[in-house]
Each structure stands twice: as C-alpha cells, then as structure tokens.
Design a protein with these regions (language model features):
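S-adenosylmethionine/decaboxylated-SAM
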Residues: 4-29, 46, 51-226
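Conserved alpha-helix/loop element of class I SAM-dependent methyltransferases that forms part
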Residues: 37-47
C-alpha cells in the first residue's frame, strides 16, 4: 500500500482548499489561458497513435495536467507519458549563450529548483496515474539511451519547455521525425526565452514548417507535423 503524501515542499494536504481558493484569488488570468491551451492541444491528439513526451518537467505542472487529460479523455493504456528532466537544479554547464545563463539565474531565483524524481513519482502514484516514465539526467545522455531501449517510439505530442538553446535544438533534431503525421510539437518558450526562440526559428526555416498558436494566449506555440 502506498503511504499517502501529507506534505511536500512546505505545502500541506490539510490546506488544499485554501490553495485552490488562493489560486483563483491571486493568479494571473494567463494561468487559466495556458490550462485551456493545453486542454485544446491534448484534445487534438486523442485519435492519433504515439506517446506524449515532455522535456523540462520542473515541478510537474504540465506533466500532471497531461496525465489528468489522459485520464479524462482516454485511459492510462491509451498512450505512455514520458518526462525528461534533471529533476533538481537547472543544468547550466556548457551553455554558450550569456542570455541563457542569465535567464536560468533569474528563473531559479524566482521559482527555485524542480522536484526530485522520487518526489514527483510519489505524487503521480498518489493521484493514481500509471504508464508514466520519468527520465532523470542530462538529456544529451538520457535521450539516446531511452531511444536505444525503445526504438519503436513514436510521438503524438512533443512538449518542449527547456528554455535554453542547446537542449532544445538537440531534442528537436532528434525527435521531430518520430512525431506522427498530424502530431504536435508544442513549444512553451517561443517568443519568451531567446535561446529556445532562435533555435525554433532556425528549425522552421530549415524544414519549411509553419508555427501556430491558439487564440486565447501567446504561449504555447506549436507545429503540426504534415
């Protein structure tokens, strides 16, 4: 039997209704806009084969959201959800762009570090979500290993939220051809973080692709694979 989680990162189960009220009292409208955007994008893939794969899990918000949408619209066995992340401190070694390094410093000062893999795994078990892989480590090492273990992998939705240039480029170039026709590449950082934005622009130009957005918010942007 799984031991219930009563508190995590200073938040307590006993105050859950206060947190929900506080969200609606104080959060910016953009938080609801993004939730609706994610819902609409997930709805578009329910008749497509392929897994949902996210890069940049952080504290698990969007991954849990996708798992909840899967539970509402499909089942755990409809598709796997995979989350890649360092699961801790934002990796900054080897970043060539000063703007990317500055962004990471500002982001961590404001938002702190992401959840550890074990912490997020416990949350997912608590919520009853199955068929989810959490892959921890440097994406330049973990993604090739994961693909070697699952050469059949195809994606219905690729969610990129890594902020900076080098890993965004690596994942796009490695996984785009595994996205099924009609599948989505969803980019959280386009026109908000310089590194990821420049990489996406280069990729669109090289591949002759079109970037789209939904009407209710400026992010995420997305590509529909022809």
């Amino acid at each position: 039997m799984t031991t219930p989680i009563n508190s995590l990162r200073g938040l307590s189960r006993d105050s859950v209704w206060d947190y929900e009220n506080g969200f609606y009292w104080f959060s910016d409208q953009s938080r609801i806009n993004k939730l609706l955007a994610h819902y609409e994008l997930y709805r578009r893939i329910v008749d497509l084969p392929g897994d949902v794969v996210e890069f940049g899990v952080f504290k698990g918000l969007s991954l849990i959201r996708f798992a909840q949408f899967r539970a509402l619209m499909e089942t755990d066995q409809s598709r796997r959800i995979v989350g890649f992340d360092a699961f801790g401190k934002f990796p900054s070694e080897g970043l060539a762009r000063a703007a990317d390094r500055d962004f990471i410093a500002r982001f961590e000062a404001a938002a702190g570090h992401g959840l550890a893999r074990d912490e997020l795994g416990a949350v997912l078990r608590e919520k009853g979500f199955g068929n989810i892989d959490l892959v921890a480590g440097d994406v330049f090492e973990t993604l090739p290993r994961y693909l070697a273990s699952r050469p059949e992998l195809r994606l219905s939705l690729l969610h990129l939220d890594m902020d900076v240039a080098e890993p965004t480029r690596f994942v796009l170039e490695t996984l785009y051809d595994r996205v099924v026709p009609g599948g989505l590449v969803v980019i959280d950082d386009y026109a908000t973080v310089a590194g990821a934005t420049d990489v996406v622009d280069d990729f669109l130009r090289d591949r002759g692709l079109q970037l789209r957005k939904l009407p209710n918010y400026r992010t995420p942007a997305f590509i529909v694979r022809p």
